[in-house]
Amino acid sequence: RVAVRTHGHGLRGRAGAASDGASAELALAVGDRAPWAPALDGLVLRVPTGGRTCVMGASGVGKSTLLALAAGECAPCSMVFQDVRLVEDASALDNALVCADARVDASSAAALLRLLVPGVDVHARVAELSGGQRRRVEIARALLCPGDAVILDEPFTGLDTAARDACAEVVLDLLDGRMLLLATHDAVDARALNISDIITL
């Protein structure tokens, strides 16, 4: 059983945020029955409006949990999950467009996919793609989704240095003032995204 409590004004990006950003107090309790054991309590996460923040730590310290709580506070937002979540039988293009802004047409989405995944057949089923290609399709989907924040949970897993750096460059080019929240165990990922605001768990 999990109980979540949040307080504050939420982690908003451009819309509805104070000029210096916003914060949320996050709490998480776990257990089989009440009283539940606190796993996270009184943590205030502040991300500047349009800013870039990294949550860093080893596997199992709660980075994904923290990002999931933050995602609930900053909706609407887009997210790249640690475990790739795509529709296997749908095409790369259909997956990229699944929550895209209505102003995004298929040709624009296809161009982004080809930029992130050089040589990809955008009409190929996701099941036919490699793990690294799937990861980049998910990054494309997140960038095409509307919202005030982009949340990335270990987004470069399985990518080599060149692919990571190329993806990071595209992410930075397309943020368009949105808040960026990254979780990673590798400081190189934060540097690739020009993040200097780092929280260590």
Tell what function each PLM region has.
Residues D83, D89-A102:
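Q-loop/switch helix immediately C-terminal to the Walker
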Residues H9, A106-D121:
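Conserved ABC ATPase "signature" region
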Residues D153, D160:
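ABC-family nucleotide-binding domains
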